[in-house]
Regions:
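Nudix hydrolase/Nudix homology domain
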Residues: 14, 52, 93-94, 103-171
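Short, solvent-exposed loop/turn elements at beta->coil junctions and helix N-caps
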Residues: 16-20, 93-98
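A short local loop/turn or secondary-structure capping micro-motif enriched for an aromatic residue
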Residues: 19-22, 47-51, 131-132
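The catalytic Nudix box helix
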Residues: 40, 57-90
Length: 171
């Protein structure tokens, strides 16, 4: 059950139902950085939407009554096995995107960033993540322009409309 707006108020709703009906719902997105590089992940083929597509470091929906910050840390650990990196809340944004098979993400997203040490090692959960890559934001944007079909709709939105939010005005 994830927090979604129904009749103007937040209520717990099954995740698949939220996406089938395109309900506005809470979400969290994390961007881990190492200097000029951001960690991106290729979603596992078993994911029920956007399988095999590249996305930001991790993203998810908070559980009912879970804080956004706790959710971000939980999902870093569940998807990538990463713990102990302090995260900075950047802002909350809203977007709506079709993600295939009649499913819709209409998210109110808390954006978090973190600085990963050069010594960071991690083991992705193969049920969630097929591959990872450290890439410069400029190179990521260029590759997304060359092969947009390889990237999730929300990553396109983040890079098109919210880079300053993600980077905190650092670049």
């Amino acid at each position: 059950m994830i927090p979604a707006w129904v009749d103007g108020g937040l209520t717990p709703v099954e995740k698949l139902e939220v996406h089938q009906k395109g309900l506005k719902h809470k979400a969290v997105s994390v961007f881990l950085m190492q200097g000029e590089h951001v960690l991106i992940q290729q979603r596992a083929l078993e994911k029920y939407h956007t399988p095999g597509m590249w996305a930001n470091t991790c993203c998810t929906h908070p559980l009912w009554n879970e804080t956004d910050g706790d959710c971000a840390q939980r999902r870093l650990q569940e998807e990538l096995g990463i713990t102990g990196i302090p995260l900075t809340y950047r802002d909350t944004i809203e977007y709506r995107a079709e993600v295939g098979d009649g499913l819709i993400e209409h998210e109110v997203v808390a954006i978090f960033t973190g600085q990963a040490p050069d010594s960071l090692t991690f083991t992705p959960n193969p049920e969630e993540v097929m591959a990872t890559q450290w890439i410069r934001f400029n190179d990521l944007a260029a590759d997304m322009a060359r092969a947009p079909e390889n990237y999730t709709p929300w990553l396109h939105i983040y890079l098109r409309d919210h880079v300053t939010t993600i980077l905190g005005g650092d670049r």
